[in-house]
């Protein structure tokens, strides 16, 4: 797929990309595991690097990355569960974009002051006027607006509907149970609102690089991810400056910090990366350097 070389932040540009009629999400393209690698980088190869980061940051770290050109993988605790926090917004937005026509995406969604939840920097400015469904999706992805995320959940039939839709695209791992902001409370041992790095990377791959979405909504989603405003210190900070990064971040209780991304090296095929982390202590804070450090290990392995 070819993507625009310049970043465009206006919703007018996003709307223009949406002119291709949207189709309901299909189950024909599963985000399943990457194709078998010819020269797989095993967990053992890099376990020392990732364990060093876990020790340095007193955290449990999960990583899965795949070079989509070679099938080469990097992984560490890739099948362990972590709270996904706000990274789900990439998927809820993708599903809403895929299930609505361009005309439906321009319909205004209304809400009240009572609907606002913590961290809603965009929706709190538009209570009186409402926002189009496209603007709601943009607020959720690019600004991680929590009220916008709940409006997307509502469009999908709540967490249950979201999970059902994810099953349709082939993700049989994600567990969706609560809305914002309760879904961010994921203590050790909790399985609600969790997934694994491998599954998160697979679903992002399916939405952005696969054929789960028609070209129009897929391009809109990709532009939103490329213009994300919350990820400068995470995966973006761990890759070379000339790489293009489309990502969605997340943070929650117990020092949880996540980032999922598709990254485009200048001369190579995209790499899909999911980094998830958490700590044992209830009041622990996250450290973005853990995510960027894990990304640096991935980059060194896949693009030395």
Stretch-by-stretch model annotation:
Residues 42-78, 263, 273:
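A short, well-structured edge-of-sheet supersecondary motif
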Residues 3, 7-8, 26-50, 155, ...:
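Structured C-terminal helix/loop/strand segments within mature extracytoplasmic catalytic/sensor domains
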Residues 153-204, 208-209:
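Mid-domain, small-residue-enriched loop/turn segments at the edges of structured enzyme/sensor domains
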């Amino acid at each position: 797929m070819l993507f625009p070389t310049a970043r465009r932040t206006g919703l007018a540009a996003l709307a223009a990309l949406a002119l291709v009629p949207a189709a309901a999400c299909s189950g024909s393209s599963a985000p399943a595991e990457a194709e078998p690698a010819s020269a797989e980088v095993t967990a053992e190869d890099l376990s020392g690097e990732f364990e060093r980061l876990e020790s340095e940051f007193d955290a449990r770290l999960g990583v899965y990355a795949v070079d989509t050109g070679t099938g080469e993988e990097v992984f560490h605790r890739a099948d362990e569960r972590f709270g996904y926090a706000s990274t789900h917004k990439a998927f809820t937005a993708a599903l809403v974009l895929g299930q609505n026509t361009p005309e439906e995406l321009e319909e205004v969604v209304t809400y009240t002051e009572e609907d606002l939840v913590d961290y809603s920097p965009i929706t709190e400015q538009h209570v009186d006027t409402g926002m189009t469904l496209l603007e709601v999706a943009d607020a959720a992805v690019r600004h991680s607006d929590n009220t916008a995320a709940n409006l997307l959940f509502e469009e999908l039939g709540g967490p249950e509907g979201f999970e059902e839709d994810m099953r349709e695209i082939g993700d049989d791992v994600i567990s969706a149970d609560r809305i914002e902001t309760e879904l961010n409370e994921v203590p050790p041992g909790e399985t609600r609102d969790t997934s694994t790095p491998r599954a998160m990377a697979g679903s992002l791959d399916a939405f952005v690089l696969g054929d789960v979405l028609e070209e129009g909504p897929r391009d809109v989603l990709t532009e939103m991810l490329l213009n994300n405003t919350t990820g400068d210190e995470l995966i973006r900070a761990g890759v070379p400056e000339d790489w293009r990064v489309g990502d969605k971040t997340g943070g929650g209780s117990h020092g949880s910090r996540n980032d999922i991304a598709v990254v485009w090296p200048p001369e190579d095929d995209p790499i899909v990366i999911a980094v998830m982390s958490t700590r044992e202590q209830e009041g622990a804070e996250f450290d973005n350097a853990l995510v960027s450090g894990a990304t640096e290990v991935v980059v060194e392995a896949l693009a030395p």
